[in-house]
């Protein structure tokens, strides 16, 4: 609401300012432009990109000065980008960065490496000087970051809008100043906001800010690198995309693969060797209209034109390239102005602009009139034409038009040097130049005999190189020729084959000549040349055997580089030759292989749904592992294993994620999408996350209170213990499993799989082959140093037992040798079986087992050890750790040092502490005696004791055990008792019986609850205290003696161990001394050898240098002597060259290269064979009918009628141009007559007089008698010269001149894409002006001139041309029947009936098929009608709607009846061709649906959540329980869920969805476009071939002719008078004027003059006006390059279109 109010206020402000325009004129210019400039300039600083992040980082780390420098660098980068709009080279360098694309990623790595560890100096002491190197680096970094923004990173929309407005309003000073002001204000606001943020961080941070800077720098370096990689992921570089192989091959030949094709990529020019311009980078996603459509994924022709009214030449017209947004804005503006009270007069606001444009237009019109009037004042058109200035070397040598910057202008481009073969490179000059050269050679022929001899030798050399047309071809080439004729199916070639076979049967010595090869069509001719030159290529590749890539060593490259490059050029040139001679057609036209269903392992060209590998079947994998664990396998077992491997199948499934690359062509980058998210199962529209927050429903205050109450109730229940029983037992396990699944889903995308898989493989190899071997070696070396036996065998055995098994991403095992398929995209896991753990020592188990241990317990321990051994595995992580499951928690590693520490503790306890126990024993005995003495004083209280000698075995060791286990419970009693028994057994040296052991157990059970000796003695019952006291004393004395002996033994053992350690230490010292002595000797010996080798090499190098110096001096002296000799030779050669003739001036008059190029384009048929075209169409439709197996009875109803196929206007045009006539071929007679046209093959009069003098005299007399009167009138003679033709489009027909000028490719390219302009050619025939020139009648002298007369008479008989009627000036409009000749009634009807006329004249073909097959071979003739050019009859019979057109009009006006007719047609089984045409005429709606209600949408959202939960669960067995529990908790409608499984798809769509389909505008009929394209090429060929025949006949005249004062009429273009740029400006000014004022040229043309026939220049004029019409995309000329890529079918066709042919 706030935004709407703001926009309303802004609109009112604009309207108020516009109302003040009459009062203040300057407000009219500022009112609309200034706010837009401020707004868009201010918004350029808001988008946050890498350059802004860099500036924020410098503010935080280095202070205000460095931050401002960084922002200045980014501003400089923005300013350079804005300047690129006005500077084209700068724009090309920034937008087409082939080199910068390769340098961006290394630069980013360099920047990241440089800033990851900042120095403390910059943090603690910010730099204050501007001349420091760090400031320059900072400025350069920010500048480069800003330049990279429009290249690789997605440029913000706001910045692009500013660029667009700057380009549009570049001439408006107010907009430029306001945008600059807004731009500066935005940056100032940005700087102040950063300073405010810095102030808050410094004052609010709990840590000292200087210490905090290091973490800030680390964070920003990571952030910048992440943003770069994210942007690169969204807009990837097209270097790594999949490339399609070029499948353009000839019709009947598969070209042999070139072995050097891959190795010769270095010889191709930059950047085609690294970039492929034909790759599909951003194709359009194909959406079929219906399920039953079988069209290809790439349409042949796509119409994206938007038709709207426009003003052209001061009148309304229909434009096909108008902007939809402009028309919508126009309607809204008109509605607003109509409803508003303020009346804005456009005439007043645009009055000044209109006046200036009108004055300019009038000036151009007046200049145009003056030039035309000058032509009518008996002047030639050459004098009236506007000239251009160009460069020249001297008076006679001019620059080529393409290379001249003055003449080519903006169309001048850099032309690469193409590689031609020798036969095409050495073409001769034009005929004018050859005539001049021949004259010069004739003059010099008699002067110098030496030059004459050189000329004859040169002539023989050319004869050997260029054979004549009647000479036979080689035998190998003849075999190729016959093979091509036998393989081809072209009817022209079949006729040619029959004629040649008949000639060969009559004459056995018949040979194929070059004349027969020139009669072949273009494709077959190219095949012949390619196959004949293929033998040369093979010989080139076979001859230099040393040129293979394996044998190309460094020495060969430098020594034989000339041969290599020469053979490489020869290998490349023939391939490029064929490509240049033939036009490449657009590729990928419905040739893509696709599958309607997403299937597994299908080779298609369209991307399908992503598939994920789950791995092979488990049962077969286990069998395979068991077989691999066997040590020895026989050959039969190996065969069985291989068979099982073949039988294994990989389980695959589709991924659950959405795939936006689906249904796109492979090798293409996915389309750019905005930042939209998909969060529902069925979502009709996407929304940006920024605007998605507006749709969030705010939580009310009452709902929050209820939530707090619920939480409080839960806490109370938890305190009371309610609900504890409802908690599941394995809650922790489920949560951990859910966590693992979420982590796996988070990393389940191709980029993460690629990086993670590579790291896992690296970690696996490092662990297996680097870390573990190093640990094993270090451990055993340590054991050797500690004088222990090494354990190499045990450690390497355990290391070999560790197996790394490669698994899929889900954890399914595949193999320990091979990686799973598509692991780089689908993920990888590595499972470690029997992981190796380094142990300090290995326990060697003996066979002696203690008898006291139970056998069952031993077996249990062994089985437990086996189970533990069998289940020992873990999963490897990218950091090298081990986990118990996939993405589980880390597994604890067993410590290496803990067993060593425990062993040291035990050893200390056993050896040191046990040996020092005699001290404790002594104090213990003292305490015992003292206590017994105290007890003896109380005899009355203690009963007597009767203790046997064998019962009281209480020893010091027993007391130690009690002290060792003072608080032992019942579980440890048995262990303690066992230790007591074992120690007593060792002490006495005898085995203890089971009875004594039981007694000890009973006694210990009685005394274990007492804490001291007092309690122990009070429980003993005996007879008397005295006996007990006596026995105690005896035992004490006996034990005291033993302890004394034991202490002496301890001392001796201790001394003995000390002596042993000293001996071992001395032995170690002796070994070290020996090693040092030997090492000293070895080092001394090595140093002496080293010094000797250095001395020897140094002396040898000195000797070599001396020898080289001596040799150089000798060579220098020899070179000086040879130089003098060469100077003398050069003087001799210069003198010889003065005597020779220049080879360029001594070329013959007619070379074979000219004949070759002339006949290459001289087709076998001089006219277009319409009969053959119609017959081919007829055959195609008949074949389609036969494939559908229609009955012959139904075919009889379909009748072929020529009126149904072609319109009257088309037939008239075809009859005028002679297209309905039969084709003609060159005969031997024609060749002989043609050869007489050239002076080289013409016999001189002297020789002819000497051979047949009488015949020659008779012929000369006849000619002189017939021309005596004419000779008396005019006695002026002229030599034979070429006629001057002043039309710029009437260029020389010699194709060798076009090849020399390198324009052949460009002109054919323009012809193919200029058919779009033809829809605007409303006036074609009546525009040419008539020029009265003097006609020069030819006075024939020679006999050969009869040929010209016969040809002239035959051409008059064949082409009956209608009389040309002059254009009247009574009406302002100019009528024409050729205008829009495919849609002739478009401009004569009203605007309301335009659509009906378009439909009424759409082509429908009704072909018939008779039962007899001979009827297909009949010729289809058209009844030609005369052209009705009278302006008083605007309508004719041809323009009246027939019955068929009425039906079509009724069909378009009644869509319901059309649907019925479609149903009836299906029932009646009409042909498929008619059905497809009817479907194209009636466009179908696009299927689109929406939910019926919001409740249904909520239910489906719940089902969506259910599916997302179920997709994570792996337990498929208990899936039903999960579904029921989720449905109960989430409130899902079970009936609706069941309907997905019970109902069909149509029933669900009726139940849940509503239809919201809408129709699109009608597509442009592709048949009209195809026909126009074909007609353009055919008309051009016809004009070209007729031009050849006329010029050949005119050049055959070798006599002198005389002129008479007689006027003839030739038609020229109006545009030829003025330059193309000025005439284009005139057209644009006429279209921009809003009033209906246009230039009427009718009164400039003489209406009284009529013409007897339509001559050849007028036919050329029709073709020229059809190919280059007068309306030449004026609306596109006014627009900028930002709009060029909108309204075209192939996205780049408009950019390739040349609006004007090169001048």
UniProtKB/Swiss-Prot annotation:
Disulfide bonds: none annotated. Residues 615-643, 1431-1494 are annotated as: Disordered. Its main location: plastid. GO terms for cellular component: chloroplast inner membrane. The keyword DNA-binding does not apply. Keywords: Chloroplast, Coiled coil, Membrane, Plastid, Plastid inner membrane, Protein transport, Transmembrane, Transmembrane helix, Transport. The keyword Chloroplast applies. Residues 618-660 form a coiled coil. InterPro entries: TIC214. Residues 619-643 have a biased composition (Basic and acidic residues). Belongs to the TIC214 family. Part of the Tic complex. This is Protein TIC 214.
């Amino acid at each position: 609401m706030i935004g709407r109010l703001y926009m309303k206020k802004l609109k009112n402000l604009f309207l108020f300012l516009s109302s003040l325009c009459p009062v203040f004129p300057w407000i009219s210019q500022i009112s609309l432009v200034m706010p837009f400039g401020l707004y868009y300039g201010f918004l350029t600083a808001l988008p946050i990109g890498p350059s802004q992040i860099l500036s924020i980082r410098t503010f935080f780390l280095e202070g205000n000065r460095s931050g401002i420098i960084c922002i200045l660098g980014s501003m400089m980068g923005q300013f350079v980008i804005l300047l690129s709009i006005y500077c084209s080279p700068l724009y090309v360098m920034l937008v087409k960065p082939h080199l910068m694309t390769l340098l961006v990623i290394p630069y980013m790595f360099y920047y990241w490496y440089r800033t990851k560890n900042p120095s403390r100096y910059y943090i603690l002491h910010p730099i204050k000087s501007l001349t420091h190197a760090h400031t320059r680096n900072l400025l350069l970094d920010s500048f480069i970051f800003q330049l990279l923004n429009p290249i690789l990173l997605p440029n913000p929309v706001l910045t692009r809008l500013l660029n667009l407005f700057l380009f549009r309003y570049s001439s408006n000073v107010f907009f430029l100043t306001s945008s600059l002001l807004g731009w500066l204000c935005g940056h100032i606001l940005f700087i102040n906001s950063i300073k405010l943020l810095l102030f808050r961080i410094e004052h609010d941070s709990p840590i000292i800010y200087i210490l905090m800077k290091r973490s800030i720098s680390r964070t920003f370096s990571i952030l910048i690198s992440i943003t770069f990689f994210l942007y690169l992921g969204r807009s990837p570089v097209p270097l790594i995309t999949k490339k399609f192989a070029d499948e353009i091959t000839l019709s009947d030949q598969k070209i042999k693969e070139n072995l050097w094709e891959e190795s010769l990529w270095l010889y191709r020019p930059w950047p085609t060797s690294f970039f492929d311009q034909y790759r599909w980078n951003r194709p359009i996603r194909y959406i079929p209209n219906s399920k039953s459509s079988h069209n290809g994924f790439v349409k042949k022709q796509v119409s994206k034109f938007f038709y709207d009214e426009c003003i052209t030449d001061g009148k309304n017209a229909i434009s096909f390239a108008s902007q939809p947004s402009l028309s919508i804005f126009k309607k809204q503006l008109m509605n607003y102005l109509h409803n508003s009270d303020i009346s804005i007069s456009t005439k007043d606001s645009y009055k000044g602009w209109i006046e200036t444009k009108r004055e300019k237009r009038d000036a151009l019109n007046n200049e145009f009139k003056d030039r035309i009037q000058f032509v009518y004042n008996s002047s030639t058109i050459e004098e009236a034409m506007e000239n251009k200035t160009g460069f020249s070397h001297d008076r006679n040598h001019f620059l080529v038009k393409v290379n001249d910057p003055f003449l080519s202008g903006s169309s001048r481009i850099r032309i690469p040097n193409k590689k031609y073969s020798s036969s095409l490179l050495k073409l001769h000059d034009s005929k004018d130049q050859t005539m001049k050269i021949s004259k010069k050679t004739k003059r010099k022929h008699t002067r110098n005999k030496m030059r004459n001899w050189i000329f004859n030798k040169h002539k023989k050399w050319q004869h050997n190189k260029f054979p004549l047309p009647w000479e036979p071809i080689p035998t190998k080439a003849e075999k190729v020729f016959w093979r091509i004729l036998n393989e081809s199916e072209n009817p022209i070639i079949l006729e040619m084959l029959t004629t040649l076979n008949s000639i060969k049967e009559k004459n056995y010595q018949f040979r194929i000549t070059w004349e027969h090869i020139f009669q072949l069509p273009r494709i077959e001719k190219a095949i012949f040349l390619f196959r004949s030159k293929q033998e040369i290529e093979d010989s080139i590749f076979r001859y230099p055997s040393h040129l293979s890539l394996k044998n190309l060593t460094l020495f060969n490259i430098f020594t034989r580089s000339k041969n290599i490059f020469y053979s490489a050029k020869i290998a490349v040139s023939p391939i490029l030759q064929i490509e240049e001679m033939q036009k490449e057609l657009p590729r990928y036209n419905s040739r893509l292989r696709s599958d309607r269903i997403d299937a597994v392992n299908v080779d298609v060209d369209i991307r399908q749904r992503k598939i994920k590998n789950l791995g092979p079947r488990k049962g077969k994998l286990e069998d395979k592992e068991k077989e691999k664990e066997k040590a020895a396998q026989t050959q039969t077992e190996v065969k069985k294993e291989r068979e099982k491997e073949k039988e294994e199948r990989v389980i695959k499934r589709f991924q659950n994620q959405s795939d936006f690359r689906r249904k796109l062509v492979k090798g293409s980058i996915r389309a750019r999408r905005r930042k939209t998210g998909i969060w529902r199962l069925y979502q009709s529209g996407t929304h940006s996350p920024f605007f998605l927050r507006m749709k969030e429903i705010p939580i009310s205050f009452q709902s929050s209170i209820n939530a707090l109450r619920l939480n409080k109730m839960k806490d109370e229940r938890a305190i009371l213990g309610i609900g504890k029983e409802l908690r599941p037992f394995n809650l922790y396990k489920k949560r951990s499993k859910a966590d693992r699944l979420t982590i796996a889903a988070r990393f389940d995308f191709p980029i993460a799989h690629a990086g993670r898989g590579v790291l896992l493989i690296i970690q696996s190899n490092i662990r297996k082959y680097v870390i573990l071997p190093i640990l094993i070696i270090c451990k055993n070396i340590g054991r050797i140093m500690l004088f222990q036996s090494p354990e190499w065998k045990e450690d390497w055995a355990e290391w070999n037992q560790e197996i790394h098994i490669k698994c899929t991403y889900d954890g399914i095992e595949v193999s320990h040798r091979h990686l799973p398929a598509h692991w780089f995209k689908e993920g990888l896991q590595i499972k470690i079986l029997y992981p190796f753990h380094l142990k300090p020592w290995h326990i060697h188990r003996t066979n002696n087992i203690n008898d006291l241990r139970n056998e069952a317990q031993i077996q249990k321990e062994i089985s437990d050890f086996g189970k533990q051994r069998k289940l020992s595995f873990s999963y490897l992580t990218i950091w090298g750790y081990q986990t118990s499951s996939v993405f589980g928690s880390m597994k604890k590693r067993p410590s290496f040092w803990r067993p060593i520490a425990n062993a040291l503790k035990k050893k200390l306890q056993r050896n040191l502490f046990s040996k020092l126990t005699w001290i404790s024993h002594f104090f213990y005995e003292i305490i015992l005696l003292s206590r017994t003495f105290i007890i003896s004083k109380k005899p009355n209280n203690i009963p007597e004791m009767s203790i046997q000698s064998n019962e009281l075995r209480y020893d010091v060791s027993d007391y130690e055990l009690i002290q060792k286990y003072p608080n032992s419970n019942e579980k440890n009693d048995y262990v303690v008792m066992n230790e007591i028994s074992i120690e007593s057994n060792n002490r006495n040296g005898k085995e203890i019986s089971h009875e004594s052991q039981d007694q000890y157990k009973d006694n210990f059970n009685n005394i274990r609850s007492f804490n001291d000796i007092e309690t122990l003695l009070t429980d003993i019952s005996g007879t008397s205290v005295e006996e007990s006291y006596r026995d105690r004393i005896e035992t004490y004395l006996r034990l005291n003696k033993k302890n004394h002996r034991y202490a002496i033994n301890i001392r001796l053992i201790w001394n003995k161990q000390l002596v042993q350690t000293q001996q071992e230490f001395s032995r170690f010292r002796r070994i070290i001394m020996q090693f040092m002595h030997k090492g000293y000797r070895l080092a001394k010996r090595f140093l002496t050898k080293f010094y000797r080798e250095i001395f020897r090499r140094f002396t040898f190098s000195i000797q070599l240098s001396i020898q080289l110096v001596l040799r150089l001096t000798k060579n220098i002296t020899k070179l000086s002597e040879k130089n003098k000799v060469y100077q003398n030779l050069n003087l001799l050669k210069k003198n010889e060259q003065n005597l020779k003739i220049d080879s360029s001036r001594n070329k013959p008059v007619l070379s074979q290269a000219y004949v070759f190029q002339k006949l290459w384009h001289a087709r076998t048929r001089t006219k277009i064979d319409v009969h053959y075209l119609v017959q081919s169409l007829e055959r195609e439709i008949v074949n389609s009918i036969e494939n559908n197996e229609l009955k012959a009875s139904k075919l009889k109803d379909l009748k072929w009628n020529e009126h149904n196929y072609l319109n009257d206007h088309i037939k008239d045009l075809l009859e005028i141009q002679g297209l309905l006539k039969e084709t003609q071929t060159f005969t031997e007679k024609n060749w002989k007559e043609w050869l007489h046209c050239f002076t080289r093959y013409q016999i001189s009069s002297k020789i002819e007089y000497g051979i047949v003098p009488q015949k020659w005299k008779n012929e000369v007399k006849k000619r002189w008698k017939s021309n005596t009167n004419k000779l008396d009138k005019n006695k002026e003679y002229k030599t034979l010269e070429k006629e001057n033709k002043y039309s710029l489009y009437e260029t020389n027909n010699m194709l060798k001149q076009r090849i020399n000028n390198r324009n052949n490719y460009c002109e054919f390219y323009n012809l193919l894409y200029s058919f779009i302009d033809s829809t605007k050619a409303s006036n074609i025939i009546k525009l040419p002006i008539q020029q009265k020139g003097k006609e020069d009648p030819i006075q024939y002298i020679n006999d050969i001139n009869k040929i010209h007369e016969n040809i002239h008479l035959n051409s008059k008989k064949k082409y009956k041309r209608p009389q040309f009627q002059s254009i009247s000036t009574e009406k302002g409009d100019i009528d024409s029947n050729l205008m829009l000749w495919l849609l002739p009634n478009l401009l004569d009807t009203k605007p309301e009936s335009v659509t009906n006329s378009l439909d009424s004249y759409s082509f429908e073909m009704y072909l018939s098929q008779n039962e007899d097959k001979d009827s297909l071979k009949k010729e289809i003739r058209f009844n030609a009608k005369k052209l009705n050019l009278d302006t008083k009859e605007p309508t004719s019979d041809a323009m009246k709607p027939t019955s068929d057109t009425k039906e079509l009009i009724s069909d378009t006006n009644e869509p319901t009846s059309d649907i019925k007719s479609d149903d009836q047609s299906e029932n009646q089984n009409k042909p498929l061709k008619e059905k497809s045409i009817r479907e194209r005429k009636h466009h179908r709606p696009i299927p689109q649906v929406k939910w019926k209600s919001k409740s249904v949408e909520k239910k489906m959202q719940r089902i969506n959540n259910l599916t997302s939960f179920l997709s994570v669960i792996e337990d498929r067995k208990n899936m039903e329980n999960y579904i029921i529990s989720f449905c109960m908790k989430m409130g899902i409608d079970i009936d609706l869920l069941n309907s997905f499984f019970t109902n069909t798809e149509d029933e669900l769509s009726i139940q849940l969805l509503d239809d919201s389909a809408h129709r699109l505008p009608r597509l442009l009929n592709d048949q009209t476009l195809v026909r126009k394209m074909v007609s353009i090429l055919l008309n051009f060929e016809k004009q070209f071939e007729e031009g050849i025949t006329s010029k050949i006949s005119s050049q055959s005249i070798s006599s002198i002719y005389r002129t008479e004062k007689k006027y003839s009429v030739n038609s020229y273009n109006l545009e030829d008078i003025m330059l193309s740029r000025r005439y284009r400006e005139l057209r644009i000014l006429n279209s921009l004027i809003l009033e209906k004022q246009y230039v009427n040229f009718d009164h400039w043309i003489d209406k009284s003059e009529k013409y007897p026939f339509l001559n050849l220049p007028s036919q050329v004029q029709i073709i020229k006006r059809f190919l280059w019409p007068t309306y030449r995309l004026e609306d596109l000329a006014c627009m900028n390059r930002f709009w060029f890529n909108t309204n075209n079918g192939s996205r780049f066709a408009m950019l390739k279109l040349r609006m004007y042919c090169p001048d």
